[in-house]
């Protein structure tokens, strides 16, 4: 199974890239984690946020291979404990499809992305900076993988 993190925003600070890559490289080849960056729409004083969200959403959906299981990261989503995420990951594997996880920009995800989703995951009730979300998602997925494979990374 391939995990695909599709996130709005490019040119992240070096610490974000290093943090994400630290967890990305830990995954085995049969559970690869890929990052796809979608350029953020230009936001200014008179920006048309609805149009920006729509364009970002179109680009995100276009990046998803046909047949992938789609999970949005969104506040109204389900809060998963590590064992619950591990269980969800197990189900994704048994389903036999790759998974695309969508992280929106400053205004969140386009309605089209939310409508296309099969599941929605809420990382926290806190507002997290979008660059940090990449690292938290990568670590959480790695931890869930470690639970499923009895790897010593996760301890109860």
From Swiss-Prot:
Q: Which CDD domains match?
A: RlmH-like (cd18081)
Entry keyword annotation includes Transcription regulation: no
Where in or outside the cell is it found?
Answer: Cytoplasm
EC number(s) recorded for this UniProt protein? 2.1.1.177
Keyword Isomerase on this protein? no
Main localization of the protein described in the UniProt heading: cytoplasm
Tell me one GO molecular function of this protein. Answer: rRNA (pseudouridine-N3-)-methyltransferase activity
Annotated keywords: Cytoplasm, Methyltransferase, rRNA processing, S-adenosyl-L-methionine, Transferase
- Specify which residues bind S-adenosyl-L-methionine according to the UniProt entry for this protein: 73, 104, 123-128
Q: Which reaction does it catalyse?
A: pseudouridine(1915) in 23S rRNA + S-adenosyl-L-methionine = N(3)-methylpseudouridine(1915) in 23S rRNA + S-adenosyl-L-homocysteine + H(+)
Q: What class of enzyme is it?
A: transferase
Q: Name one GO cellular component term.
A: cytoplasm
Q: Which InterPro entries match?
A: Alpha/beta_knot_MTases, RlmH-like, tRNA_m1G_MTases_N
Q: Which Gene3D superfamilies match?
A: 3.40.1280.10
Source superkingdom: Bacteria
Q: Give a short account of what the protein does.
A: Specifically methylates the pseudouridine at position 1915 (m3Psi1915) in 23S rRNA.
Please give the NCBIfam families that the UniProt record associates with this protein.
PRK00103.1-1 (NF000984), PRK00103.1-4 (NF000986), tRNA_RlmH_YbeA (TIGR00246)
Assembly mode: Homodimer.
Report the sequence similarity comment from the record: Belongs to the RNA methyltransferase RlmH family.
Name the record gives this protein: Ribosomal RNA large subunit methyltransferase H
């Amino acid at each position: 199974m391939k995990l695909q993190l599709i996130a709005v925003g490019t040119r992240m600070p070096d610490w974000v890239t290093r943090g994400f890559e630290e967890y990305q490289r830990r995954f085995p080849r049969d559970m690869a984690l890929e990052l796809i960056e979608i350029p953020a729409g230009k936001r200014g004083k008179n920006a048309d946020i609805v149009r920006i969200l729509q364009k970002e959403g179109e680009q995100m959906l276009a990046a998803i291979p046909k047949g992938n299981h789609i999970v949005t990261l969104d506040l109204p989503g389900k809060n998963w404990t590590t064992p619950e995420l591990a269980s969800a990951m197990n189900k994704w594997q048994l389903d036999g499809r790759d998974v695309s996880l969508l992280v929106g920009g400053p205004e969140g995800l386009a309605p089209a992305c939310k409508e296309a989703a099969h599941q929605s995951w809420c990382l926290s009730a806190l507002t997290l900076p979008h660059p940090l979300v990449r690292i938290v998602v990568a670590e959480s997925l790695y931890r869930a993988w470690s639970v499923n494979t009895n790897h010593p990374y996760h301890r109860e």
